A protein has these predicted regions:
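Short, solvent-exposed secondary-structure boundary/capping segments
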Residues: 32-41
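Generic, low-specificity signal for short hydrophobic/alpha-helical stretches with a mild N-terminal bias
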Residues: 5-7, 14, 39, 71, ...
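Residue-level recognition of conserved beta-strand positions in structured domain cores
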Residues: 25-27, 59
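Intrinsically disordered, low-complexity boundary segments flanking structured domains
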Residues: 12, 41-46
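Intrinsically disordered, low-complexity, charged/polar segments
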Residues: 46-108
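Mixed-charge, Lys/Arg-rich low-complexity intrinsically disordered regions
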Residues: 1-13, 18-22, 29-32, 104-108
Length: 108
């Protein structure tokens, strides 16, 4: 039986290990669950393993905000204490406090 445990939790702020963006976790897949086309678009020498958690992030960088799908190996915790400036954060979470966002109601 396949078992995995996510390192990061819903509402946690994380940043990408290699690229200049950060975000708040709003969903987690136990293993890769996107399209083959999405995966194949990643340069072969940078492709993450599929058998690890993948995180859905409400992400931001210096220019914009967006939704990102990132493997666990490419994330690190963000300890900046700064909230994420994404317009959809309030749809999922309560006010930013103590470095994370509490869940807003029930998520499916």
């Amino acid at each position: 039986m396949f078992k995995t445990r996510a390192k990061y939790h819903l509402g946690q702020v994380v940043r990408h290990r290699k690229h200049p963006f950060r975000g708040v976790v709003f969903d987690v897949d136990a293993m890769f669950s996107n399209t083959d086309a999405w995966y194949e678009a990643i340069p072969e020498d940078s492709r993450p393993k599929k058998d690890q958690p993948f995180y859905h992030l409400l992400a931001e960088n210096d220019q914009s905000f967006y939704v990102a799908y990132v493997s666990e190996q490419n994330l690190v915790a963000d300890y900046s204490g700064e909230p994420v400036d994404h317009p959809d954060v309030d749809d999922f979470f309560g006010p930013f406090s103590d470095g994370h966002y509490p869940l807003q109601g029930q998520l499916n």
